[in-house]
Amino acid sequence: MTVREAGVLAIGAGPANLALAVAIEESGSAELADGTLLLEQSPDVKWQRDLLMPWARSQVSFLKDLVTLRNPSSRFTFLNFLHEQGRLDEFINLGTFHPYRWEFSDYLQWVAASLKRVRIQYGARAARVDPVLAEDGSVSGWSVLLTDGDEIRCRDLVVGGGRDPRVPEVFAGLPADRLIHSAQYRTRIAGIARDEPVRAVVVGGAQSAAEMFYALHENLPQSRVTMLVRSIGLQNYQTSKFVNELFFPSFVDEFHDSPAEVRAQVLDEMRLTNYAGLAPPFLDELYTMLYRQKALGPQRSEVRAMTEVVGARVEDGDVVLDLRDRLSGKTEPLRCDLVLLGTGYDPRKPALVRELAARVGIDKVEVSRAHRVRLGDAARGAVYLQGVNEETHGIADSLISVLANRSHDILADLLARRAGTGAGSAR
């Protein structure tokens, strides 16, 4: 086992921590940049690794990349990536603000490879985080134990690995080999023979569920696929330009300063902008596919709306789902081989963060405007949380839209604390 030191240790090398890495590298503080390390459990950087279908597109403008809204002249922009790849003319000719998901993922890997001072360690998974205490009992830093037994000690910790997948309780008793969450889709589907006549059921009514439903027809062409939607039917997410202003980085201040009950109401109203709808062009393509099946055959697929799963078990080698029709109230069984969950992510803070909070005696994790966990004025070491603060920073907190500006907020707080000037923007 080896013990190493870092000034800033960031868990995860996804978009959030890469945006911060770019901000740190461009900060002018060589000491801060040289002392920053990102840990990535995978062998490379991939964005939404298990939903990188060749036809899937980003739902966010390429101008909301890791840096443009903070520093449009940066060498780390998506447009500079295209220029260096020799595809800028062709991309402009596409006439779209929404690149393919694989292309944005390639951009992230390019950014990671282009960092000069900030380091990334691949194949490194954090197993546990413990506080390092000063003589007076205050938190002076953090000890991060990796799964390979190595330890990294740091002053400041940034957690940006995203939320944990949500598996509804009704499915908890199903064997792991019969259940696939969208976070595992491509990896798990690759292990099934392409010609297998699988009876698959997709649960969920938003983008990830619909993408799995669509992709199954290509990945398993002999499959029969049923999609279960609890709502009245699949629908577009809200695309109004007026509503989209709620994704402006400037809205974060207004949201953060509002009373908790107001924030909860706004989040509920904004649900259809992100969590409960589909991109309009993709929704049209999905409906067209089902129409072609009905007209030309074979009809392998169906979408069942106003249907909820109230029971799940294995019986005689089949997975049996008990489905309740919300209109009639009747319940009937549906037999299948495989259940795919587009059920999103656990709204709680990630397990790693909850465990860390327990070790420092925090019952409820609260963060400042600069995304720093409130540990008390005596703490020298800090923890910053990225992408899991919707209840205080708005629904865009989990999205790419605010990455560039959020990285500025965290950077300003890091620099202010090192300069001894207080909390910076961390009110």
Question: Whereabouts are the PLM-identified features?
Answer:
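Glycine-rich phosphate-binding loop and adjoining beta1-alpha1-beta2 segment
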Residues: 46-65, 243-246, 278
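Flavin (primarily FAD) cofactor-binding/catalytic cores of flavoenzymes
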Residues: 1-43, 91-207, 211-427
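A conserved beta-strand/loop capping segment in the N-terminal third of enzymes
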Residues: 69-101
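Generic low-complexity, intrinsically disordered sequence content enriched
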Residues: 24, 55-56, 67-73, 220, ...
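Short, solvent-exposed beta-strand-terminating loops
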Residues: 58-76, 234-237
